[in-house]
């Protein structure tokens, strides 16, 4: 469920508040296809395909979200939205907990199971881009346990039979970045497939998943 986070800055001579918007701002070049915050449903939507394990609907503080199970230790998630080759953008937000030195890994994907996956890997302090389970690019990233992490991934065709894969990641206390956090070009045409969101519970605790969105992009 979309929320707004309020950061209050105080000092002896000043008291003020700064509102950090958590939702993705409207883009005139993007057409919404899927927008699911689970506020109007009591179960996983029928149009979603569950990947491994038992994904359930949970709620805290009047906010409903998907709970990716803590056991078994495997990759759990959902597929949703249309199956397309390019011209698609996906976004979601995740929240996980650290247990000792163990942290969950999670991310969003496009182009189906063997397509592109954007993964937050706290153990390596990296944001990773994978294609067909192979890491093709990465960037430094510091994950914050217990906070919602927002992720966005898009694939678009470029002139000359190339494809741009672009991603943004930010946490609940930050504004959405103006520039892409990670970019990569691919000369091999992607296959058509559905968007996805998933997580691996290395810390032995459930992973929260919310605000799943898909757009067609020009």
Task: List each model region and its residues.
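Beta-strand-rich interaction surfaces with strong enrichment in secreted/lumenal proteins
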Residues: 76-82, 137-143, 198-199
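Flexible glycan-contacting loops in extracellular carbohydrate-active proteins
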Residues: 176-208
């Amino acid at each position: 469920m979309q929320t707004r986070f309020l950061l209050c800055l105080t000092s002896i001579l000043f008291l003020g508040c700064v509102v950090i918007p958590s939702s993705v701002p409207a883009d005139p070049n993007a057409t919404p296809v899927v927008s699911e915050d689970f506020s109007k449903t009591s179960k996983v939507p029928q149009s979603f395909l569950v990947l491994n394990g038992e994904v359930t609907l949970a709620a805290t503080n009047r906010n409903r979200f998907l709970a990716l199970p803590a056991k078994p230790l495997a990759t759990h998630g959902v597929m949703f939205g249309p199956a397309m080759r390019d011209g698609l953008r996906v976004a979601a937000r995740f929240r996980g907990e650290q247990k000792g030195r163990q942290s969950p890994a999670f991310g969003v994907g496009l182009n189906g199971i063997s397509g592109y996956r954007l993964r937050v890997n706290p153990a390596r302090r990296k944001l990773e881009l994978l294609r067909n389970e192979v890491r093709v690019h990465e960037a430094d990233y510091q994950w914050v346990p217990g906070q919602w992490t927002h992720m966005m991934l898009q694939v678009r065709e470029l002139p000359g039979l190339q494809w741009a894969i672009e991603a943004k990641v930010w946490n609940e206390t930050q504004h959405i970045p103006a520039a892409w956090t990670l970019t990569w070009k691919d000369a091999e045409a992607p296959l058509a497939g559905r968007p996805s969101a998933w997580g691996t519970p290395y810390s032995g605790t459930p992973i929260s998943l919310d605000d799943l969105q898909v757009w067609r992009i020009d």
